[in-house]
């Protein structure tokens, strides 16, 4: 019974800590002498090359080099990726392509490829492009 009571006290302490931590904001962390502020990890004199500093983990954002532009983002940061499919793929349907399809790169088929039929893709893109190129359903911006 004592171990069960101790477990309940520990769970209640975690819940109380979680509830009261929601009342404070991140202002204490980003205060003048906090973790990121004037004398903290991103300070210009003490740890100027820390987490938030211009040369720190955040990258070269102040100099116009976004973090995802040079290979930090998925697929090399510039939309490159490889897809390998092996096996028999029985696909039936109709294909209709209308409009502009900007594809740069090469397509290589190896082995016997028997293709007959057509494919039709209609609707919105599902790749995360939206208004201004972000979000679901908006056209690509090039």
From Swiss-Prot:
Keywords: Repeat, Signal
Gene Ontology cellular component annotations, sorted alphabetically: egg chorion
Name under which the protein is recorded: Chorion class A protein Ld19
InterPro entries found in the cross-reference section: Chorion (IPR002635)
GO terms under biological process: chorion-containing eggshell formation
Statement: the UniProt record of this protein carries the keyword Repeat: yes
Signal peptide: 1-18
Function of the molecule: This protein is one of many from the eggshell of the gypsy moth.
Family: Belongs to the chorion protein family.
Annotated GO MF terms: structural constituent of egg chorion
Keyword flag Repeat: yes
Superkingdom field: Eukaryota
């Amino acid at each position: 019974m004592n171990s069960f009571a101790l477990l309940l006290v520990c769970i209640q302490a975690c819940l109380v800590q979680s509830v009261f931590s929601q009342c404070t904001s991140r202002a204490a962390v980003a205060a003048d002498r906090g973790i990121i502020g004037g004398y903290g990890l991103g300070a210009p004199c003490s740890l100027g090359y820390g987490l938030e500093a211009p040369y720190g983990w955040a990258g070269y954002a102040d100099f116009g080099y976004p973090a995802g532009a040079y290979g930090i983002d998925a697929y090399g940061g510039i939309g490159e990726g490889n897809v390998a499919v092996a096996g028999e793929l029985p696909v039936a349907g109709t294909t209709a392509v209308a409009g502009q399809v900007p594809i740069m790169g090469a397509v290589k088929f190896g082995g016997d490829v028997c293709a007959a039929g057509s494919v039709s893709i209609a609707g919105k893109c599902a790749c995360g492009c939206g208004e201004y190129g972000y979000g679901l359903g908006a056209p690509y911006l090039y």
